[in-house]
């Protein structure tokens, strides 16, 4: 059951509305979740249900304030512009993060490549009858 503490008012200072979710009908992971909503003048509040991020996971509640006007389109364009920034213009932490991600990708590619080679080698040995190695001991006396 959702409890609303202070009611929304149309004063110049937007009040903080918190929603505490605690009910026996929800799963244990979703009990006692609190979400703070900050309404601004001329906007309506939209609260989406909690989302479980992982199996063990944390509970994330997505809350968005949507105005009657279409102000969301400008935000989408700024996200696209942020993605197109070159590496030289990024701060040092972002550069290190990108280098680290690329290094991890290269390591994974190497592991996959080595595994593929190992499996091909096994396949060829099986075709010749030389795999598994324990079979070779049996074939010595033949």
Swiss-Prot record:
The keyword Ligase does not apply. The keyword Flavoprotein does not apply. Its main location: plastid. It is found in: Plastid, Chloroplast. It comes from the Eukaryota. Keywords: Chloroplast, Plastid, Ribonucleoprotein, Ribosomal protein, RNA-binding, rRNA-binding, Transit peptide. Residues 1-62 form a transit peptide. Residues 123-142 are annotated as: Disordered. One of its GO terms (biological process) is plastid translation. CDD domains: Psrp5_CTD. One of its GO terms (cellular component) is ribonucleoprotein complex. One of its GO terms (molecular function) is rRNA binding. Component of the chloroplast ribosome (chloro-ribosome), a dedicated translation machinery responsible for the synthesis of chloroplast genome-encoded proteins, including proteins of the transcription and translation machinery and components of the photosynthetic apparatus. Belongs to the chloroplast-specific ribosomal protein cL37 family. Three different forms exist, PSRP-5 alpha, PSRP-5 beta and PSRP-5 gamma, due to different transit peptide cleavage. Component of the chloroplast large ribosomal subunit (LSU). Mature 70S chloroplast ribosomes of higher plants consist of a small (30S) and a large (50S) subunit. The 30S small subunit contains 1 molecule of ribosomal RNA (16S rRNA) and 24 different proteins. The 50S large subunit contains 3 rRNA molecules (23S, 5S and 4.5S rRNA) and 33 different proteins. This is Large ribosomal subunit protein cL37 alpha. It comes from Spinacia oleracea.
């Amino acid at each position: 059951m959702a409890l609303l503490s202070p009611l929304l008012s149309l004063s110049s200072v937007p009040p903080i509305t918190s929603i505490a979710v605690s009910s026996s009908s929800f799963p244990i992971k979703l009990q006692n979740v609190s979400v703070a909503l900050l309404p601004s003048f001329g906007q309506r509040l939209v609260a989406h249900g909690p989302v479980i991020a992982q199996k063990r996971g944390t509970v994330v509640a997505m809350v968005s304030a949507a105005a009657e006007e279409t102000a969301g389109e400008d935000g989408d364009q700024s996200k696209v512009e942020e993605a197109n920034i070159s590496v030289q213009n990024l701060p040092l932490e972002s550069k290190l993060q990108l280098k680290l991600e690329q290094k991890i990708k290269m390591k994974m590619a190497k592991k996959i490549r080595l595994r593929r080679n190992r499996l091909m080698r096994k396949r060829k040995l099986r075709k010749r009858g030389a795999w598994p190695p324990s079979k070779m001991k049996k074939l010595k006396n033949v």
